[in-house]
């Protein structure tokens, strides 16, 4: 793996991390204070109509296009690129789906 590919993967990870964090935040997540609303599950329970995660999922899907382009069409495969894509995909899953699965 070249140094250029390493730097591009790091930049891609930082941009993807910030974009996923921005688009996955609930509108009223600032209300978590520990007194009345203790966690994200309480926010979802009290404010169900303000859930905008479906728009965030669609807005963040293009983050995976560079990985698909390099890995599938250009045949540039390296362990660091796979690790970066796996980390981004894991964070994407956590922010949009998994952290809400245990709210019963």
From Swiss-Prot:
Keyword Transmembrane helix appears in the UniProt entry: yes
Keyword match DNA-binding: no
Topology class, membrane: Multi-pass membrane protein
The entry's keywords: Cell inner membrane, Cell membrane, Membrane, Transmembrane, Transmembrane helix
TM stretches of this protein: 6-26, 53-73, 78-98
Protein localization: Cell inner membrane
Periplasmic compartment residues: 27-52, 99-104
Domain of life according to the entry: Bacteria
Cellular-component GO terms for this entry: plasma membrane
Residues in compartment: Cytoplasmic: 1-5, 74-77
Protein name: Inner membrane protein YjeO
Originating organism: Escherichia coli (strain K12)
Gene: yjeO
